[in-house]
Swiss-Prot record:
Organism per entry: Ralstonia nicotianae (strain ATCC BAA-1114 / GMI1000) (Ralstonia solanacearum)
MF terms in GO: amino acid binding; aspartate carbamoyltransferase activity
Protein name: Aspartate carbamoyltransferase catalytic subunit
Catalysed reaction, written as an equation: carbamoyl phosphate + L-aspartate = N-carbamoyl-L-aspartate + phosphate + H(+)
Chain sites annotated for binding carbamoyl phosphate: R71, T72, R121, H151, Q154, G280, P281
């Protein structure tokens, strides 16, 4: 008899109560998040006098970032505040975890303070899953990046950005370029693109920075930028994750740029209306040329803006679903 495993992200009714990974979520769930995010975009309009809605009024959201972050932590904080939540940013370096307290003991103590939601970034893959297993039924966990494993809200905001500019995934070719081996963003993007029916997903990079098994995920692999960029609709550039590398996987940053840096000449191989994306932080002159990053086809800053609406949508949806 085949043993089936329940998805820990879902309620018994199949609704999203935690967001831990895009893997295992249906197209309907992803589309619902993207559609909800579209409704929240107007909350951040510059001409809107009060940039708030009362969806999470009275709820406490704890941001627990055990790794450094600028865009993700800040946009989660803005998103929670625009939903009218009370936001607590834990200073990890000054917390009891720096004195040897375990992750679960930290979570249990914060839960005793009536936390309603934890937004967690951690260097260890699977840490948000561990937390989700041990919180009370009414508490929700959102993964803001765990090791190499997943970065689901980045994947979702990337999908929102692509859909905003390209509408329909079914005719698109999307290339993900760079250090895919160490990238949680790449994994989340690949799962999201294939789930949403993207016509073709490409991975471009040196052999040393591409994980095995990409073909089994429905990805076409290229080791040449010139070949991989031909006719693509969107290019997602990734930085070199030097902090996760062990050993000499590359000769030098300069040599990497010569082979895999996105220049205007290489971008010209894509479709004329192709968009350029990057999850940040960017390393100009390593994976992307400044002329491209700041060019007319770049939507990198728009990704950051859309990230607020997407994270508002995720928080609002999970907060409404309990077992």
């Amino acid at each position: 008899m085949t043993k089936t495993f329940a998805n820990p992200q879902l309620t018994k009714n199949g609704e999203l109560k935690h967001l831990l990974s895009i893997e295992g979520l249906s197209r309907d769930i992803l589309t619902h998040i993207l559609d909800t995010a579209k409704q929240f975009v107007s909350v951040s309009d510059a001409d809107r006098e009060v940039k708030k809605v009362p969806l999470l009024r009275g709820k406490s959201v704890f941001n627990l970032f055990f790794e450094n972050s600028t865009r993700t932590r800040t946009t989660f904080e803005i998103a929670a505040k625009r939903l009218s939540a009370d936001v607590i940013n834990l200073n990890i370096n000054a917390s009891s975890t720096s004195k040897g307290e375990s992750l679960l003991d930290t979570i249990n103590n914060l839960s005793a303070m009536q936390a309603d939601m934890f937004v967690v970034r951690h260097a260890s893959s699977g840490a948000p899953y561990l937390i989700a297993e041990h919180v009370a039924p009414h508490v929700h966990v959102i993964n803001a990046g765990d090791g190499r494993h997943a970065h689901p809200t980045q994947g979702l905001l990337d999908m929102f950005t692509i859909r905003h500019y390209k509408k329909d995934f079914s005719n698109l070719t999307v290339a993900i370029v760079g250090d895919i081996l160490h990238s949680r963003v790449a994994r989340s993007d690949i799962h999201a693109l294939t789930t949403l029916g993207c016509a073709e997903v490409r991975a471009i990079g040196p052999r040393t920075l591409l994980p095995s098994g990409l073909e089994h995920m429905g990805v076409r692999v290229f080791h040449s930028m010139e070949e991989g960029l031909k006719g693509v609709d969107a290019v997602i550039m990734l930085r070199l994750q030097n902090e996760r590398m062990s050993g000499a996987l590359l000769p030098s940053a300069q040599e990497y740029f010569k082979a895999y840096g996105l220049t205007q000449e290489r971008l010209a191989l894509a479709k004329p209306d192709a968009i350029v994306m990057h999850p940040g932080p960017m390393n100009r002159g390593v994976e992307i040329d400044s002329a491209v990053a700041d060019g007319v086809q770049s939507v990198i800053l728009n990704q950051v803006t859309f990230g607020i609406a997407v994270r508002m949508a995720v928080m609002g949806i999970v907060a409404g679903n309990n077992d």
